[in-house]
Amino acid sequence: MRNLMVLVIGLLGWTLTSAQTANTEKGKITGKLINTEGKAVVAATVTLQNATDSSLVKAVVSNKEGIYELENIAYGNYLLAVSSVGYEKTIKELSLHTGTAAMDFSIAPSSKTLSDVVIKTKKPLIEVKADKTVFNVEGSINAQGSNALELLSKSPGVLVDNNENITVKGKTGTKIYVDGKMMQLDNKDLAAYLKSINSNDIEAIEMISNPSAKYDASGNAGIINIRLKKNKKYGSNGSVNLGLVQGYTPKGNGSVNLNYRDKKINIFSNVGGNLGNYEEHLDLYRIQNDSIFDQKSRNVYKDKSINAKAGADLFLDSKNTIGVMATANFNDNTWGGNSATNIYYQPTGDYVKKLEAFNTIPGSRTNANLNLNYRYADTAGKTINVDADYGLFRGTGRSFQPNNYYAPNGDLLYQLTYRNYTPTDIDIYTIKADVEINKWKGKLGYGAKAAYVRTKNTFDFYNVENGTDVKQLSKSNSFDYKENVNAAYINYNRQLNAKWGLQLGVRAEQTNSEGVLTRADGIHQADDKVTRHYLDLFPSGALTWTVDKKNTLNLTYSRRIDRPTYQDLNPFENKLDELTYQKGNAFLKPQYTDNVELTHTFMGFINTSLSYSYVKDYSTMITDTANKNATFIQQRNLASQQIYGFSIGAPLPIAKWWNGYVNVWGNQQKFKGEFNGEKINRSYNLYGLYMQNTFNISKKKGVNAELSGWYNGKSVWGGTWVVKPMGGFDVGLQKSMFKGKGNLKASVTDVLFSQYWKSKTNFGGVYIDGEGKGESRTFRLNFTYRFGNNNVKAARERKTGLETEAGRIKG
């Protein structure tokens, strides 16, 4: 721990020292750019590089007179390069040893016409912007051959724990979007869906901490948007991708992308799949009442999944476009687990008995969405976007749970066997419209959305007696839930002057819901029907101050909401296994969060932020005693939460062949509340480190390498679980081939096999000490081949209307 803190402090010191060195006020370089006709060259890029290794020092753009200025440059020898579309790139040597050096350029027109030129740009792996951080997956070697869930764990500040809960910089409540559509799935179903998305089909992952009023208000820790690849070329083209993964067992994945585009229509399609087994080992040591349970488990997840997408855009004219898009995910998998639990009498430590339990959960999940879209855009800056969507989720949950109890001498005491049938049907209908116009010297946006959700859940519980399933009416039920959310927003954005920018917005959301529980035994309970109606306002705003050429400050605020998942509202008991029950909470309230963040951007690339969050009616999964020997789990509004945080991130252009990125974050979380008469007043200090390095080994041969790693200090989940520090690093190598059409990537993830979790909780009369390890260390081999027309033409980007309703489904 001490060594890690030294490393973190050293990295921060190095980053700040490097920034100060880059900013040493020594001298100035200025000049004028003209073409062969003597006219000024406007908006040309002027880059200053070290003469020794060609590493970037600074870059500016020429003004309308063709003048450029590079200020605060340390004395030394440099290369000065000028580039502009339609002109030849020009490079000159320059020595700065006095206060000001002048260097004018006369640049010649390019010998190639624009139609002859293929423009290629390479985005940095990590882009840090004032409002979001972008992980450009497409350019990462170590990201290939994995899936969307694994990629999230490799993103700056993101942690995916053993239960596949996603936290960002220690904060829970992040909402996951895919192509602008919120995934309305609970942890289990969301994880299964994300695992089915090949990393090779992902273009980028965007992390937005304080979304504007245009976005749905769900997500107290902001949103993560996974942008899938979309073909951007005229003509017929496509790509094929094949991947192999070797962990405990071999696995495979693949995808095919096809696209046709001309001036009138764009037709696109994609299909991909995953096949393989994933293994996890889990140990739990639990003390409850006067019993000790020492459990060791091995779980295997057998994954067979297919993702498909198809659609078309019809360009009616230069202003009007209509489109249709269908996406589907088919997941046919089996989760199987076996465990051995030694049970002791806690006061004396005497060995009482042993439980050998098995749990087999076969099932299929289907997630499909249909989107109809209309878009209008004119040259005056007016845009209109209308989306109509239908989404469905179908899950055929089943489980088979044999449990055998043995005496200390090994004799069989008794057997208990159960079978569950738990199908889930969810239908989602949404329609939304967004308008943006130039108004009051800025941009005015407004819109509305209506969403209707219907979910049906069945839980049938059976005792298996002499090979026959006997339905237990007192433990079986059905739960129907209906919800309607109507929303409207207005948002205004304006650059007030050269130094100040302003964004203000407010979103109103009206929620109507009804949950009805029907027990199979016909008994009514107090919470078998709960109806709610409430209206909320969610203001947001941002103020940007450009202090000078080197410093910019950005202050943002937003209010957010986290509604309960649909199944968390089902007030019936669900027997997960012999020792664990789960029950919903019909009276579970939404939690509300106020977020404030101040971001300082230095030299255009070093971002430092300070943040504060207050969460009202904080909800978490509580572990309690259902009876003497079983653990009882329920989602409850436990307490209030306060989070004080900081983060610093910067790209590091170390050398011409070596680029890096570092992000360090930390926060303090405070929880206050009461549970069963017990006062809660807890505080935790958390921190994390993320680093990414790319190496251009041979530009001529197209060989690149990547080294990335992360470390999270002690973290907290749900206010009651403390997770011990963990981390890991990956290495990868990439080779371009077949004249740039092919790409071969090889990588090793979690090289030191250090990504295992350990956590403890002592709450509600239950003490649990757990640890687990999955298949984090793997060897991955991935090959991609692109074919067809390679002329660059940007494709239309669009979000669907299912932005919120599709993350709250729980299977």
Question: What is the role of each PLM region?
Answer:
Residues 296, 428-432, 471-477, 589, ...:
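Outer membrane beta-barrel strand-and-loop segments of large Gram-negative receptors
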Residues 424, 477-483, 532, 561-609, ...:
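Outer-membrane beta-barrel signature, preferentially recognizing the C-terminal barrel domain
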Residues 34-39, 45-49, 83-87, 97-141, ...:
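Short, acidic, small-residue-rich periplasmic hinge/interaction motif at the N-terminus
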Residues 217-224, 232-282, 303-306:
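Outer-membrane beta-barrel translocator/receptor signature
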Residues 71, 181-209:
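Short acidic/polar hinge/loop motifs at secondary-structure boundaries
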Residues 307-331, 359-517, 546-551, 604-610, ...:
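Face-selective signature of the C-terminal outer-membrane beta-barrel domain
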Residues 51-67:
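Short, acidic Ser/Thr/Gly-rich low-complexity loop/linker segments typical of extracellular
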Residues 102-106, 148-151, 190-193, 207, ...:
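N-terminal periplasmic accessory domains that precede
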